[in-house]
């Protein structure tokens, strides 16, 4: 339903997208993942026909999206990041009726459709309330309702859970999952790695405008190369928070080690060099008479995979 092939786009000297391809099938959620500036929003705008690519082609339902016909545009729903298209001085109901009228519905049709969508996004009780009084989560749900006015086959959502609390974010994902289960093809752009597990069917990870990874969440986890660990050392401190010199000598050239900033006083943060092997470093510590009580990854598997592929060491 959604297909992008070899998309490239520059803004002056800056390369926003470089030979990016993406496919989203009916009933599928594809997470477009990456840090700020990776090119996610630009790709979403290319897919919806708002930005023309310098090279490559984007198609939705078999039709090229740039300068696409009005009837195709009506079959695509967009929830942009920081949506400013809502009118905050009128009610949620009035917002939906207004946009429904812009799409060619009669007032009666637009009103009936608005109430249907308010029920779908759980805003019926707030339908007549001025949308400026809505919480961030409620405004996001109203934005999704607006995107669904024409019953689109394809839904593009950019940073839907930004600034939402965990409960509101989970509600948003549940709503979108339900739409996909009813056949919608969904592109979900996000920089929040934790929200895609158990939600997205596939992942495309962008890094500085290029595709760094494409596959399932399980495949993403499989390529994780953890470099940072928390060690619990029973005899790790010489005095106060100072490290035993033997510890630094044991890991020198293969890792750095420092007292953890918080947590248990026996915890230390170990950061492996790129070519270092954890088992060998731990063996060196043991040989130096350092008692390694426990070792765990500083981050989860999926966080390690994301940060490794996105090129971050933070």
Q: Residue spans of the language-model regions?
A:
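ABC transporter nucleotide-binding domain
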Residues: 173-269
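Conserved catalytic motifs of ABC-family nucleotide-binding domains
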Residues: 151
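Conserved ABC ATPase "signature" region
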Residues: 97, 101, 108-126
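Catalytic Walker B motif of ABC-type/P-loop ATPase nucleotide-binding domains
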Residues: 155-159
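Helix-to-loop junction immediately C-terminal to a conserved catalytic motif
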Residues: 48
């Amino acid at each position: 339903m959604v297909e992008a092939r070899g998309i490239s786009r520059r803004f002056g000297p800056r390369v926003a997208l470089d030979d990016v391809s993406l496919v989203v099938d009916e009933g599928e959620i594809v997470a477009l993942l990456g840090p700020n500036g990776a090119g996610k929003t630009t790709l979403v705008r290319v897919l919806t026909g708002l930005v023309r690519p310098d090279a490559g082609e984007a198609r939705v339902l078999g039709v090229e999206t740039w300068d696409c016909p009005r009837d195709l545009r009506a079959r695509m729903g967009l929830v942009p990041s920081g949506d400013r298209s809502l009118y905050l001085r009128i009610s949620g109901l009035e917002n939906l009726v207004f946009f429904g009228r812009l799409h060619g519905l009669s007032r009666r049709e637009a009103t009936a459709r608005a109430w249907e969508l308010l029920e779908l996004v759980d805003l019926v009780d707030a339908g007549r309330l001025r949308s400026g009084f809505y919480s961030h989560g409620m405004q996001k749900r109203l934005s999704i309702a607006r995107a669904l006015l024409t019953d689109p086959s394809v839904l593009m959502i950019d940073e839907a859970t930004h600034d939402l609390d965990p409960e509101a974010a989970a509600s948003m994902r549940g709503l979108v999952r339900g739409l996909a289960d009813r056949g919608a093809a969904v592109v979900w752009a996000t920089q929040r790695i934790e929200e895609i597990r158990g939600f997205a069917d596939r992942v495309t990870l962008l890094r500085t405008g290029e595709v760094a990874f494409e596959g399932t969440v399980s495949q993403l986890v499989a390529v994780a190369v953890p470099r940072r660990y928390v060690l619990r050392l029973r005899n790790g401190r010489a005095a106060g928070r100072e490290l035993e010199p033997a510890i630094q000598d044991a890991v020198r050239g293969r890792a750095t080690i420092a007292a953890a900033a918080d947590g248990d006083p026996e915890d230390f943060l170990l950061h492996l060099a790129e070519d270092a092997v954890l088992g060998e470093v731990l063996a060196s510590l043991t040989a130096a008479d350092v008692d390694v009580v426990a070792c765990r990854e500083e981050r989860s598997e999926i966080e390690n995979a994301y940060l490794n592929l996105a090129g971050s060491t933070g």
